[in-house]
Amino acid sequence: MIDKYQEPKHHQLRIGLVSPQQIMAWANKTLPTGEIVGEVKNYRTFSYDRDSETYKPERDGLFCERIFGPIKSGVCACGESRKIGDEKEKRTFCEKCGVEFVDSRIRRYQMGYIKLASPMAHVWYLKRIPSYIANLLDEKIKDLENLVYRDFIFAGPLTKKPTLLRLRGSFPESKTKFSGSRDILSQFLKTKSFQKLRDREFSAGAGAIRKRLANLDLEVIIYSSLAEWKKRKEQKAEIEIKPTRTERTEEEDRKIEKIKRRMRVLVRRMELAKHFLETNVKPEWMILRLLPVLPPELRPIFKISEVQFISSDLNTLYKEVISNNKILSDSLLGCKFVPEQLLTGQEKIVQVAVDQLLDNRISGQPRRDRNKQLYKSFSDILAGKEGRFRQTLLGRRVDYSGRSVIVVGPSLALHQCGLPREIALELFQTFIIRSLIRQRLASSVKTAKKQIREQERIVWDILEEVVQEHPVLLNRAPTLHRLGIQAFQPILTKERAIYLHPLVCKGFNADFDGDQMAVHLPLSLEAQAEAYLLMFSTQNLLSPGNGDPICVPTQDMLTGLYTLTLGNRRGICATRYNLWNRRNSQNERIDDKHYGSTKGKELLFCNPDDAIGAYRQKRINLDSPFWLKVTWGQHRIVSKELPVEVHYESLGTHHEIYGHCKIVRSVKTERHFIYIRTTVGHLFLDREIEDALKDFRARVV
């Protein structure tokens, strides 16, 4: 349970780039002796201790207790135990082994790091589409991959520093006299002077990319990309100035497509540079200098027999990185000269090992086990339906939640959902108990629970009151975007299914063929305010991806509207303007016998209720045309349509006949009548629109 009187430790979860200093801050610990631990230097996991006849973690290894914490709470690697104190108390360490006396649960979140001998590219930002590194540097992905894997090199600009021709003074005097240029070159390639020249004038690998990323000016990138985008837009307009597509040649069409692709690249580059500026993230962090090591509990190892262990695939991939990185580090720091080809090959091996650890599927050389199965990399553990986010974090059962099948609720408002009473009774149980005790309807919590269990009438009344002021959250897995979870006002139903308005189905990507949805209850006032202001379905009418309307009528709705408004399209001319085919000005009762004899003739009704009553008595069909008399104050004809014919009578009355209506005007009485040719379906639709407008006006007022 979260203590509401204590400031929560974590407010949000964000995935992104971090600096090397932050990675070190996560892992480093300072021992009382002044030694800093946190770097994983040994690729071994456990070793057999003959004294205790048990397996213990290797020092500075992947399961080191000094780095990640003790395996048993309060027990160090030496076997000494001490009482675990509060987090606010001073940290205590073992004087012999340097293990901190803390709870063993620290091994679930304490991290380590691997110090890479040379910078390595992060495969997520290099090989994934779109490639962020390629977008920022405005280079091709293939060229950058060749550079990372040492197939290409960057040649630096000319400087005023010594070059090859002026480095003769770097040799000892006794070795400057050689008979031939080949001997001079071979001797020079083995000196440190050549290494300095190579590092200054040429660069390869991820280190070269890191230098270019560090020298980028993001504001200049934004302005230059915008200027080029405007220039490309003008070029595109010059080609498209021709009125018809047939006048353009195939070459011009190819130029237009090429310009469009370039404009899309420029837009992505500007957005990426703007994102780096807003988040205060440096682009060179996409090149790794320190590789984080996950806590041991997230990559466990199990003992199944005396000599057999089962380990996570991550441990195998970490071992490969550490062992190859150690070889590279020894080669770079060694006193002996190492040929450039060996260094290049070893750096490429380390880069491949890092790629396999981060994402084994998109790495150039995926690593497999004995059964030819791919090792599960860091990306495989996070992504997918069985990944850590969807299965362990998002897929876990939580309190104050329920689940049921969804069915269509066309009578609901857009912000409402039908919630089964059984689910609501369980979700709002604590609120009902509090209300029963406050109103002195129950003397204790036990008595209130008994009343809820027996489902007394007062319980349902209180539930109705509580539900009116409390929103609920509906979620359908998988939650691919923010519209996958929305807030609704619950309406209690006696059924066991959740009723959902059909217009919100597109946001959830749901249909009514047996889909299930989860119900969550926001508890705090902040969560309820967020649900009302941001998460209500009426606040999410547009798609967050492209801004298009997401609450659009479905095919069922369009078919229903078509059927509802389907009628005789022949118009008034089909009856030769004869409004009185059926002499029924007084709206007399039409029995079945008479109605059968008037087949093909159109009836007249003085008000909509009589027409709807005749439909319910099956006197007319849903699409049967009839004449409806309305007063001038209720409807006004606003149209530029000219009358088909005008009839003038001797008593001063004249009839203006239009396509689907007839207006009767009287000069003496100044009375106006309108006869509309319509159907019952149109009446139903008109009433629904009027009710919706009345409800909208009431809420606005």
From Swiss-Prot:
UniProt-listed Gene3D superfamilies: 1.10.40.90, 2.40.40.20, RNA polymerase II, clamp domain (4.10.860.120), RNA polymerase Rpb1, domain 3 (1.10.274.100)
Alphabetical UniProt keywords: Chloroplast, DNA-directed RNA polymerase, Magnesium, Metal-binding, Nucleotidyltransferase, Plastid, Transcription, Transferase, Zinc
Keyword Zinc-finger found: no
UniProt record, GO biological process: DNA-templated transcription
Single GO MF descriptor: magnesium ion binding
SUPFAM superfamilies: beta and beta-prime subunits of DNA dependent RNA-polymerase
Details of cofactor binding: Binds 1 Mg(2+) ion per subunit. Binds 1 Zn(2+) ion per subunit.
Protein name per the record: DNA-directed RNA polymerase subunit beta'
Pfam families in the cross-refs: RNA_pol_Rpb1_1, RNA_pol_Rpb1_2, RNA_pol_Rpb1_3
EC number: 2.7.7.6
Residues annotated as binding Zn(2+): C76, C78, C94, C97
Location(s), subcellular: Plastid, Chloroplast
Cofactor(s), names only, from the UniProt record: Mg(2+); Zn(2+)
Its biological purpose: DNA-dependent RNA polymerase catalyzes the transcription of DNA into RNA using the four ribonucleoside triphosphates as substrates.
Lineage, broadest ranks: Eukaryota, Viridiplantae, Streptophyta, Embryophyta, Tracheophyta
Catalytic activity line of the entry: RNA(n) + a ribonucleoside 5'-triphosphate = RNA(n+1) + diphosphate
Record bears the keyword Glycoprotein: no
A Gene Ontology term for the protein's cellular component: chloroplast
Residue numbers binding Mg(2+): D511, D513, D515
Family statement drawn from the similarity comment of this UniProt entry: Belongs to the RNA polymerase beta' chain family. RpoC1 subfamily.
Subunit structure: In plastids the minimal PEP RNA polymerase catalytic core is composed of four subunits: alpha, beta, beta', and beta''. When a (nuclear-encoded) sigma factor is associated with the core the holoenzyme is formed, which can initiate transcription.
Organism listed in the record: Pelargonium hortorum (Common geranium)
